[in-house]
Structure formats: C-alpha cells, structure tokens
Curated annotation (Swiss-Prot):
Protein name: D-ribose pyranase
Functional note: Catalyzes the interconversion of beta-pyran and beta-furan forms of D-ribose.
Subunit architecture: Homodecamer.
HAMAP family recorded: D_rib_pyranase
Catalysed reactions, semicolon-separated: beta-D-ribopyranose = beta-D-ribofuranose
Broad EC category: isomerase
Gene name per UniProt: rbsD
Primary localization class, coarse: cytoplasm
Family of this protein: Belongs to the RbsD / FucU family. RbsD subfamily.
C-alpha cells in the first residue's frame, strides 16, 4: 500500500507527472469541465468531500508556486476565500517559497481550465470554490 498522503491513484498519478508551471485545478461541484481536460471526480454528495479537504490533500503532495482564483470569490464567498489564503500562506511557509496569488474573472478562469493537466471535482456547493494550482519545483 502507498505510504504517501494521496491514496487516490488518479490524483497521485497526475501530481507525479506535473512539470514546472503545469497546472492542476481543484473545483466545486458546479464548475464546467472541458471535455478535453482530464476529470477526476471526487464528489460523493453535496459538501463531500469539501473543497478545502481536497486542496489540503493535493497540496501535501504537490509543490505549488502560484495559485489563480476567480475575482468573484472575494465578494461571493469571502469566508472560503480567507480560509484558502490562510492555507496558501501556511503552505508557502512549509515549502519555503513564495506562492504568487493572482485573480481573473470567472469566465477567464473557466477558459484557463482547458490548459490544465486535470480538474479535480470536489463535492463543494458554495460559489466560486475553485483554484488553479501551478506546479513549482522542489529544488
């Protein structure tokens, strides 16, 4: 049995194949996922697993150098926005690097998902609970 933190074989596989600046999306249950992009569907029911549960597990195994969020999260989901920013702050301290955070419109965000290595769908049912994680290097 795998000893690492990620037991899901699809998530483990996609993270292991990420190169520098490749992207991986963690999204809520409602984000449209392009047919051309790999979908890893973790959603079991509303809220299970939560967006932050998925982000937490993914970022334990993935080196993150940047994160992209939809601007709308600031107004439409401020509590989750703050939780995510706190998580990313703690992650950069743990990794020993600065994680660049940027924002774009939700419409542009949806277009950017098409270039991702995969989209991991959570069971989150709150607005704009989506992040594009950009892979860094560990050296």
């Amino acid at each position: 049995m795998k000893k690492g933190t990620v037991l899901n074989s699809e998530i483990s596989s996609v993270i292991s194949r990420l190169g520098h600046t490749d992207t991986l999306v963690v999204c809520d249950a409602g984000l449209p996922i392009p047919n051309s992009t790999a979908r890893i569907d973790m959603a079991l029911t509303q809220g299970v697993p939560s967006f932050m549960q998925v982000v937490d597990v993914v970022t334990r195994e993935m080196q993150v150098e940047a994160a992209i969020l939809a601007t709308e999260i600031k107004q439409q989901n401020p509590q989750l926005h703050e939780t995510l920013l706190t998580h990313l702050e703690q992650l950069q301290q743990h990794q020993g690097n600065t994680i660049k955070i940027s924002y774009t419109t939700h419409e542009q965000f949806k277009k950017l998902t098409a270039d991702s290595q995969a989209v991991i769908r959570s069971g989150e049912c709150s607005p704009y609970a989506n992040v594009i994680l950009c892979a860094g290097v560990t050296f």
